[in-house]
């Protein structure tokens, strides 16, 4: 009810007969807010969820407020409801302080916005408590004022608004101080203490001088819990394990929620959530975390989570495959098969199976086999390139397009869908291997088939991803008629290739020696992207570091192992949490460029969560698997510790022995005690296992042998500041731009770049390391050109956007065409369209291979998310109606109401002079799965959707 109406209603009673004079009978105006939904400040501190403190508290009269504890630096945010149905933003310039500013509904396009998603931006020069006051006059706009909160205002929302970090050590008997050197010659101090070192369950205190992410308190108390614990003479070692186990317990929840599902209402599930800022379960996060020891630490909860990420088809679909599929979560262009790393699930399942026994093993093994098999068969159709023998799709986990791919790919996501990624192919290899193993019991024919698939895929990966010059596998291959090996490298893919047996021993050793590290750890991607803030770009991710540690152990690269261990320890200790990510040249959870006179839009990591699940898994893996040596790959518990002299001399300097207690495995508790050698000044070797014994009660005792020095090294980057944005030692150059024109019988290609370039036609290198200028070419047939920049260190950029010229055939489809925009009409092809044929046949002008793609619009969701990537089977038939070629077209989201894009292509061989016809048939996408029935956007609660508006089918000769 609007205030003016309330005033009128009350006034009408004054002095009139029949209006009760007793105050108890007087009508009470109802204060009903204009916006009925709960509202949140989403994005501040990198938290895009609906945290308690981010909720705007209704004060009455359409006014709201909250106080947030905010870290220094730049933030993007919106005023929004839990389901993103309501979004208000101040999008044309950064928000100011102490000034009421109007926030408008998010525009339909981002043309007038400061950033790609029309977010508000604000920069906090000081960390602290800030008050956000919001009011509404009507639904068309919100007014918000940001001010520094007073002490009284802060305490209203944070009962512990001020906490002296020294308090966490009061009354403690033992204390240990550790200094962590910074890039600028300063150091951070972390103090560890324990109240009673001999207590059955100890109390630890940890405080840090590091400026913490999200302005969190500088100290915390950890009370040890029942379950696994480590006991040593080093307070820091024991305290950090206790902290990590506490965070694992905090991540164990009974319900999950996400703004995209069930309108952000809780979903009952006894699982692990993904992080302090991520309250849902995602396939890859859980799978990698499970593989990194969580499946051993809590098999039941991991099994619940893995089962949650399996789904049958909806009852309203044709249920193409009998049984369940692994869920590919919302993602680039509407998800699968642009994103195809759902096979990571198999890594978590394989580790879980090693911890199960008896009927529990049998039941999960059968379910896992069927789900993996169904998934592999589906991927073999829609995401497998028979010509290369590789699987297509986005890099695993590196799913924020411009962070690792070309700058233009966020606006043309199908280029990512047709690329091939190292990591995604390796996790397919692992899934196929597990399927082959399980099929020995359930389907002997498939066991043979999957074994052959795995061998063929391993060969294809080595043939096409290996860069002998760099001594590493490239991160991805770009499809330009022929695949181009891009000069980019990612540690997750490299490490997975090593530990999965794809890389030979010689290749594995080269990779670990050649992949660049900083003194603070290994970046997930190299070289870095210019003009892109920190997230995947320029970042350490602890779970990837844990995989690099596994690879270092396997290759006996002591230098790489030490780098990984110190990186994991430093990250957890200085930040008082297992963070999502860290800037790679500083080891910090946040780097503020404006502190150094640089562009604040490069600040980051732009999102960073405490107690990130796979980071927790990574730290536990370092302790449990590497240092204490617990391995279960065979289904039995084996103890094979890997302790370097650096670990002995630094991390465990005060200990004579270390013990892991209360480790449960298949219904029995075990402990591992390792006697340590004397401290030395030699940090270059490791101590081999000399002897392992176990008594009847499950107590392992390990004796280490004499120090073994090995010839190991890493490529260490030094002297580059973390805020430097153009240093060619660590950055690749920006990709070029091309203008291509047909001139008489030739083609003119104008290349713009400040660097030398490589120029390609249809995947063939036609100009190598030449000046960026105009070039002439005389192609035969249809030609697509792209270029790469090359900097002074020899690093090549991501590919430029291809520009194509040449003759083409265009085929309209049967159906009712409707105008989309000037000169473009389209026919809607939905899941219910049946077989949609070409409106006319066509004749092949020459014999050869042709590419077929669709010119389409799909605006069912945002470019970066969703489940409605349109997937259709395209058949090419001869004049007798025989199918001569077929393949699956992907028509990912384009993010524009009237925009047009080309789908991913398929290739078919045609004969000169013969007549052909095309036909489109429905396939499926992730919206067809039951698990997405509660998804609140297209393809979710209103039913599955596999739809595009198609103008025509383009046919081009690939010569």
Which role does the model predict for each range below?
Residues 216, 276-394, 421-429, 539-561, ...:
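Aromatic-rich carbohydrate-recognition surfaces in CAZymes
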């Amino acid at each position: 009810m609007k205030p003016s109406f309330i005033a009128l209603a009350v006034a009408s009673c004054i002095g009139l007969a029949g209006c009760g004079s007793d105050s108890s009978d007087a009508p009470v105006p109802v204060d009903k807010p204009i916006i009925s939904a709960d509202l949140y400040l989403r994005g501040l501190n990198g938290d895009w969820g609906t945290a308690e403190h981010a909720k705007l508290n209704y004060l009455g009269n359409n006014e709201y407020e909250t106080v947030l504890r905010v870290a220094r630096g730049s933030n993007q945010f919106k005023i929004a409801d839990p389901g993103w149905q309501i979004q208000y933003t101040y999008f044309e310039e950064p928000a100011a302080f102490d000034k009421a500013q109007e926030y408008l509904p998010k525009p339909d396009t981002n043309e007038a916005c400061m950033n790609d998603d029309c977010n508000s931006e604000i920069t906090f020069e000081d960390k602290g408590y800030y008050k956000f006051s919001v009011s509404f006059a009507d639904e068309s706009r919100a007014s918000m004022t940001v001010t520094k909160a007073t002490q009284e205002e802060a305490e209203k929302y944070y009962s512990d608004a001020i906490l002296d970090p020294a308090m966490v050590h009061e009354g403690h008997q033992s204390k240990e101080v550790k200094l962590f050197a910074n890039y600028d010659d300063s150091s951070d101090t972390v103090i560890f203490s324990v109240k009673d070192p001999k207590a059955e369950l100890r109390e630890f205190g940890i405080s840090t001088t590091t400026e913490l992410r999200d302005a969190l308190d500088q100290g915390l108390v950890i009370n040890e819990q029942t379950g696994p614990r480590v006991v040593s003479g080093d307070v820091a070692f024991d305290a950090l394990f206790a902290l990590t186990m506490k965070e694992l317990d905090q991540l164990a929840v009974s319900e999950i929620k996400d703004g995209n599902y069930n309108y952000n209402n809780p979903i009952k599930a006894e699982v692990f959530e993904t992080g302090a800022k991520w309250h849902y379960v995602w396939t890859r996060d859980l799978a990698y975390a499970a593989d990194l020891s969580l499946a051993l630490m809590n098999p039941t909860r991991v099994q619940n989570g893995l089962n949650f990420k399996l789904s049958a088809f909806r009852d309203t679909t044709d249920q193409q495959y009998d049984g369940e599929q692994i869920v590919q979560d919302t993602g680039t262009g509407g998800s699968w098969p642009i994103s195809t790393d759902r096979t990571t699930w198999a890594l978590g399942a394989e580790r879980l199976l090693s911890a199960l026994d008896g009927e529990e093993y049998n039941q999960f093994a059968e379910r896992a086999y069927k789900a993996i098999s169904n998934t592999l068969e589906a991927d073999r159709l829609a995401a497998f390139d028979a010509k290369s023998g590789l699987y297509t799709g986005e890099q695993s986990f590196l799913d924020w397009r411009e962070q690792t791919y070309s700058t233009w790919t966020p606006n043309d996501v199908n280029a990512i869908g047709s690329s091939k990624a190292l990591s995604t192919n390796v996790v397919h290899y692992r899934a196929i291997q597990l399927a082959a193993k399980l099929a020995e019991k359930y389907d002997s024919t498939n066991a043979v088939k999957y074994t052959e698939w795995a061998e063929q895929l391993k060969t294809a990966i080595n043939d096409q991803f290996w860069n002998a010059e760099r001594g590493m596998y490239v991160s991805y291959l770009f499809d330009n008629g022929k695949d181009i090996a891009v000069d980019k490298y990612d540690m997750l893919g490299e490490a997975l290739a090593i530990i999965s047996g794809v890389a030979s021993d010689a290749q594995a050793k080269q990779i670990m020696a050649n992949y660049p590290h900083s003194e603070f750890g290994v970046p997930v991607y190299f070289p870095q992207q210019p003009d892109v803030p920190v997230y995947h770009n320029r970042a350490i991710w602890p779970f990837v570091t844990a995989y690099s540690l596994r690879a270092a152990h396997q290759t006996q690269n002591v230098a790489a192992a030490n780098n990984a261990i110190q990186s994991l320890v430093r990250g957890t200790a200085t930040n008082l949490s297992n963070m999502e990510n860290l800037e790679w040249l500083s080891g910090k959870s946040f780097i503020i460029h404006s502190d150094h006179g640089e562009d604040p839009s490069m600040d980051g990591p732009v999102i960073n969560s405490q107690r990130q699940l796979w980071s927790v898994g990574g730290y536990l893996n370092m302790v449990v698997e590497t240092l204490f040596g617990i391995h279960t790959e065979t289904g039995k518990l084996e103890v094979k510790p890997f302790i370097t002299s650096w670990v002995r001399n630094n991390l465990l300097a005060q200990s004579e022995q270390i013990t892991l207690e209360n480790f449960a495995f298949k219904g029995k508790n075990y402990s591992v005690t390792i006697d340590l050698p004397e401290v030395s000044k030699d940090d270059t070797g490791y101590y081999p296992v000399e002897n392992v014994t176990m008594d009847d009660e499950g107590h392992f005792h390990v004796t280490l042998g004499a120090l073994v020095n090995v010839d190991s090294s890493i490529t260490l980057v030094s002297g580059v500041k973390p805020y430097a944005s153009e240093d060619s030692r660590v950055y690749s150059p920006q990709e070029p731009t091309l203008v291509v024109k047909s001139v008489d019988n030739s083609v003119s290609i104008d290349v713009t770049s400040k660097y030398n370039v490589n120029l390609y036609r249809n995947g063939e290198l036609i100009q190598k390391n030449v000046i960026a200028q105009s070039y002439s070419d005389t192609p035969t047939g249809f030609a697509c050109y792209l270029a790469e920049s090359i900097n002074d260190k020899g690093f090549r950029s991501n590919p430029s956007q291809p520009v194509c010229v040449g003759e083409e055939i265009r085929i309209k489809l049967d159906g009712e065409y409707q105008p989309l925009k000037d000169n473009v009409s389209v026919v809607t092809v939905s899941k219910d369209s049946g077989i949609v044929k070409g409106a006319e046949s066509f004749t092949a002008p020459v014999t050869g291979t042709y590419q077929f793609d669709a010119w389409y619009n799909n605006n069912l969701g945002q470019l970066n998310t969703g489940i409605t990537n349109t997937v259709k089977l395209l058949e090419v038939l001869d004049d007798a109606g025989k199918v001569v070629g077929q393949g699956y077209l992907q028509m990912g989201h384009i993010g524009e109401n009237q925009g047009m894009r080309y789908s991913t292509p398929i290739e078919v061989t045609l004969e000169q002079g013969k007549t052909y016809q095309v036909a489109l048939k429905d396939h499926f996408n992730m919206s067809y799965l039951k698990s997405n029935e509660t998804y609140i956007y297209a393809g979710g609660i209103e039913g599955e959707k596999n739809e595009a508006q198609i103008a025509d089918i383009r046919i081009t000769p690939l010569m």
